[in-house]
Amino acid sequence: MKFTLNYLMIKRLGETGGFEYNDISPMNELAPDTEELINGLPVDILSETDEILKTQGITDGELKPAKPISAFIKALFAPEKCLRAELKEENGSSDVYFIPFDGAWLMMNAKHGELTAAGPVSYEIAKEYIKAALSSALENGVLSVQYRDEKCKRSVTVTNAEEGYAFFGSLFDKAERKERVYIHSFAKTEENKKHIAKMLTGEKGFELPEGENEQQDRLSAKRVLRGIGIALLVNICAAVIVAVLKAVL
């Protein structure tokens, strides 16, 4: 299965289907982008979008989402889990989401106002994608990975800094309403690269591998702080930046 919907189509399918997105959904990022897109388009663009959806059989006579697409919109707006990987490189960027769908996962690429969904895929495919994105980021780029579910929100930004692999991590516990911040500059070894990959995919928690001394944390944090400008460029949240500053100063 593979199909593409633009953001306006997704907006209208959500509205006519009566769906509201939760705090796990990719719509937390897509909805603001959609509103920004609408502001630069003709005022009748939504009615034109409705006509296109009806003509293509995506909606019925009452503009309700047809059954096949309705299941996708429901999964998109109210997933139980969501994994996002955003890779920024000098020659471009990619923004990919994974959500559960029909007993497996959907891989969705968000680009230029369109969402291309493909699947079903296994979670192993998602992990392999993140590992490949990490390899690219540690060559010449910045990778931001976010995992969201009903209990927590886990965010990580990784890049290749001058003195090591700069790692910014935050874990927000929804029940306790508390956020914990992790920051470290890893030595540039293959073992550390594998360890970081496992933290990104959730196979490991935020922990240091053997060979990375916790007593070096303060020095490590100071080295990572030099890359704070990079973190800002990839929209790492202000709370993380403040927490990092407090931890180092």
What are these regions (language model features)?
Residues 1-51, 68:
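Short, amphipathic alpha-helical interface elements at domain boundaries
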